Amino acid sequence: MXFLXFXLXLLXMXXMXXXDSSEEKFLRRLRRFDEGRYGPYQPFAPQPLYPQPYQPYQPQY
């Protein structure tokens, strides 16, 4: 879902046709989004895959 929105935003950036102020604004918004995603504040952080109960591979003989 996030990847889809990112691709849409990239499409919009390609269509913008080089207006400097809007490009800078877009880049600032992207940077803020990344800070929110990987910084201390994660409102929509997904559930961690680990720790999970570790199940070693046991072949069926």
UniProtKB/Swiss-Prot annotation:
Pro residues biased stretches: 43-61
Residue ranges of the region described as Hydrophobic: 37-61
Tissue expression remark: Secreted by parotid and submandibular glands.
Ranges where the record places region Disordered: 37-61
Signal peptide positions on this chain: 1-19
GO terms for cellular component: extracellular region
GO terms of biological process kind: biomineral tissue development; defense response to bacterium; regulation of bone mineralization
Localization of this protein: Secreted
GO molecular function: hydroxyapatite binding
Keyword annotations from UniProtKB, A to Z: Biomineralization, Phosphoprotein, Secreted, Signal
Region annotation Hydroxyapatite-binding: where it falls in the sequence: 20-25
Modified residues (Phosphoserine): 21-22
General function of this protein: Salivary protein that stabilizes saliva supersaturated with calcium salts by inhibiting the precipitation of calcium phosphate salts. It also modulates hydroxyapatite crystal formation on the tooth surface.
Stated family: Belongs to the histatin/statherin family.
Protein's name according to its UniProt entry: Statherin
Gene giving rise to this polypeptide: STATH
